[in-house]
């Protein structure tokens, strides 16, 4: 064996965005398969070059749907797509580095690379690093009892539960946590899953209901178990709110405030679906096992909000994905700059669910979990909050018919196009305008411009005008539907109206940025029509 060590990089062929990512890799001068040769001893310069190549490949491989769609238009000069993507890419690189090698020089090289990656993780741009402001007047007695119950039942934690200013209850690091440290570990026996239904007197009745899902079964079990004074999980149920305050509980005034927004449709559709399910289900539960006083619409909605806002999809050792409630873990708040991103699989060796941190979290800082790559409207509807900061997943979808063309470019395979705040784009030059390239190329195609080389675009500036005017007209109508901004005193309004107003203002900000970009783009194109480039 020579004193070399190869790291093999590959874009999986089953990646749902394989062709899009292949194109992005090509733009970086990379193929779908790359081999990185690490010599026995690397200088700092060569080590940095190796890490840069790994990062370029890793970032693209780990792009999600929204990040792929906005692609290079959202990439910073430093090559960063998003904080989420950067953390995922760096974690992916670490997973590629062998734990051991036969040659000492290889070991030294790999250790140097591993240290360089961990250093990058601790320096991720945009990551929140601030001490949590604890509200001392709120005594977390029930929460403390739950943690004690958890520890008595095998839970291991390096987190402290507290009331945090601006967040409600949250989890604070009780010691410095570095990359890979397990902040929280929960044994399977302390997780609420469908297994408890199968071992209850409910199951013989529920299994006879056509089409009932395991998720619905465990939800119905929870509605009754919550009132069981002898329940194993009583300390957990005692910590749950009487009202979850999600978008599903919005009152009439809040719903009226949402007129003209995308969120209004999302909430109304979700509530209608829940009501239909309840009306279909309850007549089938006329049995002493299901006391009517426990299965009211209000209790059903509460249970739905509990599972929407607190449950997690967990993969068990048998390979089955189950919807579970995880005591203690439910106190971890969401952030677009999370510490914990990989936590959905039970460890076979320990029969427990582990929550390792993917970036450092210092003692006294709030430890954040990623609930998923969700829009703010989804988080408000099902979780009851709006995330702090600019959420890159706040997109406005635009549906178009798929263009049927054998020679079509991969951009046109998008069946749903989208726009978001154009301040997130790094390119506002002509032919970009801060708007996503797939959408622009789709609209160019719709106006008869089949080829989109820079020469073609310069020769068809009238098409550019039409594309920008099309987008401008669409979003002018959206802005009109939102109406004028309210002058209501938010400090003295109900919680749901306050959230509705903030959500509407966020949508207004996004639409305003799109209109500004269209106006600036139209002006730019007009200038080049009058004074063509030489």
Tell where the protein language model's regions lie, with residue ranges.
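Conserved, structured regulatory domains from eukaryotic proteins
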Residues: 204-241
